[in-house]
């Protein structure tokens, strides 16, 4: 996968923000600070179990997410970890739903975002930020996370996942201190550990060709998933964004999957597929 497969043209972040009216979703006061990613020089800032303060929005990440959802005409999105991303994803899905040229495709969760989180508090905070016009798009799911194994490798699994077939999976949760239990004394609840969610691996065989997975950071987790995926995935890591992308490139499963690929991704999907054959 090349970066141009995801972003055919360079994004003017501030122009995109204004043209898509995202400032009203995120908050003009927040946006006026900076669009670029901010970093904290304290190496323990993001791995402090006592730090309950939600991370501030990273506008460049949010704008790229919005762009990808619209560009790929995504209809069903699965998100791990709620926040500002939930609102931005829902807005992009809502705008996709306004397309008057949508063909009749087989999709039981058409134009829905399903967001999973381990914190009822963060779910409630996000709910309060959602504009009324997007409330029917977002479906929140609370679930605990448990230390587990995948093919004998220690990892974490959510106790419950929404029963959907997503076009895009965005992974930005859970944090490493949420999982309960341990496997032979090992858990992620240590500042030197890292998140290691494996739910995608357990559901891989259900995912349809054309599915895109995005890991926001979480490099160790993304590498674990990459080394255990079994189907024909195209992979890209973009250091500038610190994001990992996986696209499932396979021939369509049948006429219904093909019809959806043709509408959402177009002929360029088959060009990418042919590169892997």
Q: Model features per residue range: what roles?
A:
Residues 1-58:
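Rossmann-like AdoMet
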Residues 60-73, 197-201:
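Conserved alpha-helix/loop element of class I SAM-dependent methyltransferases that forms part
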Residues 73-83:
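Conserved class I S-adenosyl-L-methionine
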Residues 86-90:
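Conserved SAM-dependent methyltransferase scaffold
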Residues 100-117:
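Conserved SAM-binding motif I beta-strand of class I
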Residues 119-165:
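S-adenosyl-L-methionine
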Residues 158-173, 179:
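Short SAM/SAH-binding signature in class I
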């Amino acid at each position: 996968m090349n970066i141009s497969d995801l972003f055919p043209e360079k994004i003017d972040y501030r122009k995109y923000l204004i043209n898509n009216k995202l400032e009203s979703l995120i908050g003009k006061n927040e946006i006026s600070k900076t669009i670029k990613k901010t970093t904290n020089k304290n190496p323990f800032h993001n791995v402090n179990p006592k730090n309950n303060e939600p991370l501030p929005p990273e506008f460049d990440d949010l704008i790229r997410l919005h762009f990808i959802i619209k560009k790929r005409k995504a209809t069903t999105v699965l998100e791990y970890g709620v926040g500002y991303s939930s609102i931005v994803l829902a807005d992009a899905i809502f705008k996709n739903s306004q397309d008057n040229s949508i063909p009749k495709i087989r999709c039981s969760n058409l134009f829905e975002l399903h967001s999973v989180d381990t914190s009822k508090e963060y779910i409630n905070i996000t709910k309060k930020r959602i504009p009324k016009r997007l409330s029917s798009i977002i479906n929140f799911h609370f679930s605990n996370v448990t230390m587990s194994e995948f093919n004998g490798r220690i990892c974490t699994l959510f106790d419950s996942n929404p029963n959907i077939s997503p076009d895009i999976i965005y992974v930005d949760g859970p944090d490493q201190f949420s999982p309960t239990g341990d496997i032979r004394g090992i858990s992620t609840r240590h500042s030197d550990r890292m998140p290691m969610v494996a739910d995608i691996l357990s559901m891989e065989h259900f995912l349809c060709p054309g599915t895109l997975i995005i890991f926001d950071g979480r490099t160790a987790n993304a590498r674990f998933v990459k080394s255990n995926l079994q189907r024909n995935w195209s992979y890209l890591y973009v250091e500038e964004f610190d994001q990992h992308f996986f696209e499932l490139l396979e021939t369509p499963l049948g006429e219904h999957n093909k019809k959806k690929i043709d509408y959402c991704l177009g002929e360029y999907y088959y060009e990418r597929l042919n590169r892997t054959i």
